UniProtKB/Swiss-Prot annotation:
This is Small ribosomal subunit protein uS9. The lineage of its organism: Bacteria, Pseudomonadati, Pseudomonadota, Gammaproteobacteria, Cellvibrionales. Belongs to the universal ribosomal protein uS9 family. One of its GO terms (cellular component) is cytosolic small ribosomal subunit. It comes from the Bacteria. Pfam families: Ribosomal_S9.
Length: 130
């Protein structure tokens, strides 16, 4: 196995990502597939790449990711969060740059629960005055 490996856990909505960084040529593997195979939409791929592009480490690391739960954008956000944490484990000096971009903070927004008597979380049944 790799001599030097850095790890970060990322979460977003119901998705959890485990990100492993090893020094290499810039390969990104998500659940055994390449990034382009795993994420069909270009926007999701851009979200994943944001931290390494910001810190100019695109060709420096091989990234191996295991991600579970949620949808594609939730998973992309979880990978970005985990990748940010792994980069900070590699070099703590990157923290201010990543913090300024807003990648360090976990996005705590979750789906609001459906309430009894309502159609959705906040949508009410139609009101009839008479």
């Amino acid at each position: 196995m790799a001599a030097e490996q850095y790890y970060g856990t990322g979460r977003r909505k119901t998705s959890t990502a485990r990100v492993f960084l090893t020094l290499g040529g810039g390969k990104i593997t998500v659940n055994g597939k390449t990034l382009d195979e795993y994420f069909g939409r270009e926007v999701a791929r851009m979200i994943v790449r944001q931290p390494i592009e910001l810190t100019d480490n695109v060709e420096k690391f091989d990234i191996n990711v295991t991600v579970k739960g949620g949808g594609s954008f939730g998973q992309a956000g979880a990978i970005r969060h985990g990748l940010t944490r792994a980069l900070m484990a590699y070099d703590e000096a990157m923290r201010p740059t990543l913090r300024a971009a807003g990648y360090v903070t976990r996005d705590a927004r979750e789906v609001e629960r459906k309430k009894v008597g309502l159609r959705k979380a906040r949508k009410k049944p139609q009101f009839s005055k008479r």
